[in-house]
């Protein structure tokens, strides 16, 4: 039985003080959660949020990292820096990173491998654009991302990996894939992973849905057999909304 995982991606929102206020509001609301709870603040707030969540059931994730150990990469964050802070998760390949910062699958594959070297659980984002969905090439697009991003990982690493399926057309648009659409696509993702790494690893891997997830939609999504959680954007910026999603089973 896979344990659900709900992760909040704050994106470029919340100063350190605002983030700490949000965490303090959130702590009592999710203390009895039956799922893994992760918050992903901006890089500058990671240290403060890790300290603020010590001794709680809230884990902290980063929104990105570099694939090199160190070096002349101005403005970047090394995996060892995240590990030393006590960060446990890292979002890799978010569609905004792919779209605005030119991230590609070859670099993401390096990042995946580097995350495991530094005890960071990757939340790998994959997804198709509206044009790709309307052209009926969703499965081809996702299969290519999966094959390139996961190449060379071990079965044990695959079992630990979290994939977030985020249809790009549903991010921040208010549009949401129906729960049936999400389930069908996520089942395909799991099948593709099984073809590469075997059914056992694929069955252990947790796959989230991301794309305008709200308290009103989470219950129906989580009732589906292949959906193991959510990567939450806008709704993670309000403690009550995020807690309502985290406590979807109550």
Curated annotation (Swiss-Prot):
The protein's Enzyme Commission number: 5.3.1.1
GO molecular function, one term: triose-phosphate isomerase activity
Xref: InterPro entries: Aldolase_TIM (IPR013785), TIM_sf (IPR035990), TrioseP_Isoase_bac/euk (IPR022896), Triosephosphate_isomerase (IPR000652), Triosephosphate_isomerase_AS (IPR020861)
Pathway: Carbohydrate biosynthesis; gluconeogenesis; Carbohydrate degradation; glycolysis; D-glyceraldehyde 3-phosphate from glycerone phosphate: step 1/1
GO cellular component: cytosol
UniProtKB keywords: Cytoplasm, Gluconeogenesis, Glycolysis, Isomerase
Keyword Aminoacyl-tRNA synthetase included in the entry's annotation: no
Active site (record annotation): 94 (electrophile), 166 (proton acceptor)
Annotated localization: Cytoplasm
Top-rank taxon, per record: Bacteria
Residues involved in substrate binding: 9-11, 172, 212, 233-234
Primary location recorded for the protein, binned into one broad class: cytoplasm
Catalytic activity: D-glyceraldehyde 3-phosphate = dihydroxyacetone phosphate
GO biological process assignments: gluconeogenesis; glyceraldehyde-3-phosphate biosynthetic process; glycerol catabolic process; glycolytic process
Transmembrane segments: none
PROSITE patterns: TIM_1, TIM_2
Assembly information from the UniProt record: Homodimer.
NCBIfam families: tim
The family this protein is said to belong to: Belongs to the triosephosphate isomerase family.
Physiological role: Involved in the gluconeogenesis. Catalyzes stereospecifically the conversion of dihydroxyacetone phosphate (DHAP) to D-glyceraldehyde-3-phosphate (G3P).
Official protein name in the record: Triosephosphate isomerase
């Amino acid at each position: 039985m896979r344990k659900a995982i709900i992760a909040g991606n704050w994106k470029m929102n919340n100063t350190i003080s605002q983030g700490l206020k949000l965490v303090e509001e959130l702590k009592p609301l999710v203390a009895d959660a039956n799922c893994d709870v992760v918050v992903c603040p901006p890089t500058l707030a990671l240290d403060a949020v890790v300290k603020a969540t010590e001794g709680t059931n809230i884990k902290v994730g980063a929104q990105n990292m570099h694939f090199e150990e160190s070096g002349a990469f101005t403005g970047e964050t090394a995996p060892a820096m995240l590990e030393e802070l006590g960060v446990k998760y890292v979002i890799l390949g978010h569609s905004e990173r792919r779209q605005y910062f030119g991230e590609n699958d070859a670099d993401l594959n390096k990042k995946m491998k580097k995350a495991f070297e530094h005890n960071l659980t990757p939340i790998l984002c994959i997804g198709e654009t509206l044009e790709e969905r309307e052209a009926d090439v969703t499965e081809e697009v996702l299969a290519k991302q999966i094959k390139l991003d996961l190449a060379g990982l071990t079965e044990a690493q695959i079992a630990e990996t979290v994939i977030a399926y985020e249809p790009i057309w549903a991010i921040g648009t208010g549009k949401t894939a129906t729960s049936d659409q999400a389930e069908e696509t996520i089942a395909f993702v799991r099948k593709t992973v099984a073809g590469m790494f075997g059914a056992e690893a694929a069955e252990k891997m947790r796959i989230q849905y991301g794309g305008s997830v709200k308290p009103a939609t989470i219950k129906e999504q989580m009732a589906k057999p292949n959906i193991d959680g959510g990567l939450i954007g806008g709704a993670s910026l309000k403690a009550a909304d995020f807690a309502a999603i985290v406590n979807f089973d109550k």
